[in-house]
Amino acid sequence: MAKAKFERKKPHVNVGTIGHVDHGKTTLTAAISAVLSKTYGGEVRNFAQIDNAPEERERGITINTSHIEYDTPSRHYAHVDCPGHADYVKNMITGAAQMDGAILVVAATDGPMPQTREHILLSRQVGVPFIIVFMNKCDMVDDEELLELVEMEVRELLSEYDFPGDDLPVIQGSALKALEGQPEWEAKILELAEALDTYIPEPERDIDKPFLLPIEDVFSISGRGTVVTGRVERGIVRVGDEVEIVGVKATTKTTCTGVEMFRKLLDEGRAGENCGVLLRGTKRDDVERGQVLAKPASINPHTTFESEVYVLSKEEGGRHTPFFKGYRPQFYFRTTDVTGTIELPEGVEMVMPGDNIKMVVTLIYPIAMDDGLRFAIREGGRTVGAGVVAKIIA
């Protein structure tokens, strides 16, 4: 049994299936599980197990998601599949299932459909970096030219949303036939696995990214100075490092003169750890919750951005009524609420609970942000929406 322990050393990559209803996302997920476990070992999850997706709650939002795992010789994959369109929307916006790459499933019998387009747009908005296409149900199309036409359509659609439509891998296969164990179609699943391995680059680990710590609390320790505490989101902070305090007010520079965890002094604080960072020459009043401590020049404060937002339904504890332009809720980033105003797209008068919508948000003061940052929309402490920064404007 030494092998299983060794497997953990393989790079871990998060992927998922996206695409129109009934184009075969769940069947493909089951086929990948079956073919890869047969070829490389691992646990098989059948269609019924995947289709019966457990209900999860992410930031108060109900999402049905199935998680499966599989291995190729060089990598370990975690794969998400959702039963309904609404689950995809919620999953992608809340970042409940962050994807390093997505498998877009398009039935060759139908070609691209409305949700195909919507999932590609969502992938663009929430920052899914890579898409691989699996053209499904190819066993049902005899006409070679028709297959070529569908492939061309899908590639054009992806290019329309700034994905490299001409260059990304498109695999023509049949998930059902692969699941039934027909060798020619099983080979297509292995071809898809090969595309995952080669086309999606190994994701950068949190610890290798530039240091960032969202400040949760500030203390002054007599004779030592000011300590900020929080959980390191990414990177490493070492004693002696220069750091910036970003957001809310003008950015200031200081130096980390100590790191402590559970009252012990350390040389560094790493991604995932809760720690206190001692700052040189910083006054207690210079720093507040809602700011971040970061590697200099790695992140900037912004107030205006385009976002993709999911508005909670009444059943999820959201609003019972729509909202209109002029709506001024709080936007909760990392550790703090900031009031902001919204601008709705041309021709949209109101937003109903349960909708997803693109909106431009302007905050009353700046917050440290990058594209892809998640936030909640709150009214008096109650979450009424979830969003993601799609594009920073100012």
Swiss-Prot record:
What SUPFAM superfamilies does this protein's entry cite?
A: EF-Tu/eEF-1alpha/eIF2-gamma C-terminal domain (SSF50465), P-loop containing nucleoside triphosphate hydrolases (SSF52540), Translation proteins (SSF50447)
Please list the residues that bind GTP: 19-26, 81-85, 136-139
* GO MF annotations in UniProt: GTP binding; GTPase activity; guanosine tetraphosphate binding; translation elongation factor activity
**UniProt entry keywords in alphabetical sequence:** Cytoplasm, Elongation factor, GTP-binding, Hydrolase, Magnesium, Metal-binding, Nucleotide-binding, Protein biosynthesis
Where does this polypeptide localize?
A: Cytoplasm
Q: Where is this region: G5?
A: 174-176
What is catalysed by this protein? GTP + H2O = GDP + phosphate + H(+)
Tell me which Gene3D superfamilies the record gives.
P-loop containing nucleotide triphosphate hydrolases, Translation factors
Give one Pfam hit by family name.
GTP_EFTU
What residue ranges are annotated as transmembrane? none
Q: What InterPro entries does the database record attribute to this sequence?
A: EF-Tu_GTP-bd, EF-Tu_GTPase, EFTu-like_2, EFTU_2, G_TR_CS, P-loop_NTPase, Small_GTP-bd, T_Tr_GTP-bd_dom
Q: What is its EC number?
A: 3.6.5.3
> Where would I find the tr-type G domain in this sequence?
10-204
Q: Give the GO cellular component terms, alphabetically.
A: cytosol
Q: Where is this region: G3?
A: 81-84
According to the record, the residues making up region (G1) are 19-26
Q: Which residues are Mg(2+)-binding?
A: 26
Positions of region (G2) = 60-64
Which EC class, in a word? hydrolase
| Annotated region described as G4, given as residue ranges | 136-139
Assembly and oligomerization: Monomer.
Q: Which family does it belong to?
A: Belongs to the TRAFAC class translation factor GTPase superfamily. Classic translation factor GTPase family. EF-Tu/EF-1A subfamily.
Please explain the role this protein plays, according to its UniProt record.
Answer: GTP hydrolase that promotes the GTP-dependent binding of aminoacyl-tRNA to the A-site of ribosomes during protein biosynthesis.
* Name of the protein: Elongation factor Tu
Q: Which organism is it from?
A: Shewanella denitrificans (strain OS217 / ATCC BAA-1090 / DSM 15013)
Gene name of the encoded protein: tuf
